[in-house]
Amino acid sequence: MGNMRSLVKMLMVVLFLGWIFVWIMISTNRFQNIWTPKLAKYLKTTYFGPQGMNLVLLTVPMMFIAVLSCVYLHTQKQPSQTQSLYKCREWKVKGRMGRVMMVMNPLGIVTATELTFSLLFLALLVWALSNYLYLSYHVHLHNHDNANDMCRWQAKFRAFGLRIGYVGHYCWAFLFFPVTRASTILPLVGLTSESSIKYHIWLGHVSNFCFLVHTVVFLIYWAMVNKLMETFAWNATYVPNLAGTIAMVIGIAIWVTSLPSFRRKKFEIFFYTHHLYGLYIVFYAIHVGDSWFCMILPNIFLFFIDRYLRFLQSTKRSRLVSAKILPSDNLELTFAKTSGLHYTPTSILFLHVPSISKLQWHPFTITSSSNLEKDTLSVVIRKQGSWTQKLYTHLSSSIDSLEVSTEGPYGPNSFDVSRHDSLILVGGGSGVTPFISVIRELIFQSQNRSTKLPNVLLVCAFKNYHDLAFLDLIFPSDISVSDISKLNLRIEAYITREDKKPETTDDHKLLQTKWFKPQPLDSPISPVLGPNNFLWLGVVILSSFVMFLLLIGIVTRYYIYPVDHNTGSIYNFTYRVLWVMFLGCVCIFISSSIIFLWRKKENKEGDKDSKKQVQSVEFQTPTSSPGSWFHGHERELESVPYQSIVQATSVHFGSKPNLKKILFEAEGSEDVGVMVCGPKKMRHEVAKICSSGLAKNLHFEAISFNW
């Protein structure tokens, strides 16, 4: 198994380096004028036409990597002794490369890996622009030798606008990789979609800036040569300028509404505007043409596979078992799941409640452990914003069921919670919730006597005393004393806006639990193609892409080639790229639907078993469940393990945690893992402390859902 993984990894590295090499060389004079004519003899066939070269050099390698990564990630889930040793070395390398290098706005927390790859990518963009400008100014402008200085200046100005657009195209080759939620590419470098959204934002800013400059330059150029109406031209056999104009208008709308100041104040406008990305892609592809579209096809193809599979999953109604209403007015929702659904700590689940919004989906942190809780999955929801406020109102009313759809779970492909000697978990407000799943996973691992558990220090800061109810969720309700006896947990809780414990507690502030009746259309959350089924996802990717190549080859050979004869100047320019997009969508639809339905049929037995289990519960809704320990309310005898939370917790009023003191006083551990989730200021403060070099045993990791 280890040899096969090494072989697959080596093959992926070779393919990726070759793919990057093509991107490096494609802007050079050697590639344009020497290599391209030679390659065209072999790759510009009657079956693929002018787009054949880009398909072979830039599309096939990355699609092949996506398939191989499914095999690699599948074997990673099969543990062995050699693999555990390999993982140890891998974590050490990731620790060094994940060290914080800088903390600054607007980039945020930048690790060594991020800084290295960002600088390399910027170098690639500068290299491409300089090469393209050299080609334009010193090679292509020889036709203007006899022209006056004004014509040469105009030609150079136009060339700059054209080439800056090419640089933006480079960004589009990577733009959709970070937002592919069930990506098989991101886990290869230890990333998740949620943690990679900032790369999508960076790429979006750079590409939109390049395209805006490209558009403005051409508008000025056409005004100078009295051809301003070219802005609205739609050439049948050449670049349709109007398509580019429409794409730019959509792009600016998406760009402006995604700026942090706009997005946070008017999230719904941002949300709905961002869903214009489909039109943006269509008009952009029409503008650049089929050959250039094939250069960026892999990340778009993989994104749409993921998007369609997510759509298929979201058509199912998920079985909501119960809802806890915390004294802090926050919620914990518990869903039924099949026992075959596995996920890692710090994972997230997307929720959709049609009675609140027909279109909106929102991500929430999973607090349960798939190893400890085989048949249920829980998420915590903070009441913040109009959507969560409406959900809270719904659940507070006298309802016996709620229609909910889910997507996910999504999270790290692997998460070894016991890899450090000690763990310091720093959370602010609802930022504590990802650490609940970490602690529950440690409880599960404590059942294995051979596992050495780290000492855990949970440092949490809350605005008000009633927010301490978050800590009631650390242990599952059915946990026993023996299950937590090996866990060395210490909690330091800070109440920043109150100087002492409230003397009284309002009745409506008690922790309440509501149970919901099962509905015929509800089903447990089951594994989706991705983290739980990498091989099947690989089958979807491979079959849909092979089908796409066959269909595009047939259409080109028997429909386009008889008209165009590979000249690229006779058959309609727009129709050519529409064929590529249409056939790609058809292949994704057919392949994904067949595999999804096949897997759904196989999962039916598991669904039936889970339904029997949840239906065996007597669904009565108590007015309130046992209250929170931190509100002095008595619990039932079987809830005695919760006393250990109180015993392990020190509550500090009227102050914030001294994070520098806490981190530097980490006792007697060579390897201290520091995880932080909360407000940006808190994350940045912890990152600066860990990167200061004063404590080399601190290994930093940030969990952020505020992008």
Swiss-Prot record:
Its cofactor is FAD. FAD binds at H362, P363, F364, T365. Heme binds at H200, H214, H274, H287. Induction: Up-regulated in roots and shoots by iron deficiency and copper deficiency. Induced by copper deficiency in a SPL7-dependent manner. Its main location: membrane. Keywords: Cell membrane, Electron transport, FAD, Flavoprotein, Heme, Ion transport, Iron, Membrane, Metal-binding, NAD, Oxidoreductase, Transmembrane, Transmembrane helix, Transport. It holds the Pfam family NAD_binding_6. It comes from the Eukaryota. NAD(+) binds at G408, P409, Y410, G411. It catalyses: 2 a Fe(II)-siderophore + NAD(+) + H(+) = 2 a Fe(III)-siderophore + NADH. GO terms for molecular function: ferric-chelate reductase (NADH) activity; ferric-chelate reductase activity; metal ion binding. Residues 313-416 form the FAD-binding FR-type domain. It is found in: Cell membrane. GO terms for biological process: monoatomic ion transport. The chain crosses the membrane at residues 10-29, 55-73, 107-130, 199-222, 273-297, 320-340, 534-556, 577-598. Residues 30-54, 131-198, 298-319, 557-576 are extracellular. InterPro entries: Cyt_b245_heavy_chain, FAD-bd_8, FAD-bd_FR_type, Fe3_Rdtase_TM_dom, Fe_red_NAD-bd_6, FNR_nucleotide-bd, RBOH/FRE, Riboflavin_synthase-like_b-brl. Residues 613-627 have a biased composition (Polar residues). Expressed at low levels in roots, shoots, pedicels and inflorescence stems, flowers, sepals, stigmas and anther filaments. Residues 608-630 are annotated as: Disordered. Ferric chelate reductase probably involved in iron reduction in shoots. May participate in the transport of electrons to a Fe(3+) ion via FAD and heme intermediates. May act in iron metabolism in reproductive organs. May function as root surface cupric chelate reductase and participate in the reduction of Cu(2+), for Cu(+) acquisition via Cu(+) transporters in response to copper deficiency. This is Ferric reduction oxidase 5. It comes from Arabidopsis thaliana. The lineage of its organism: Eukaryota, Viridiplantae, Streptophyta, Embryophyta, Tracheophyta. The gene is FRO5.
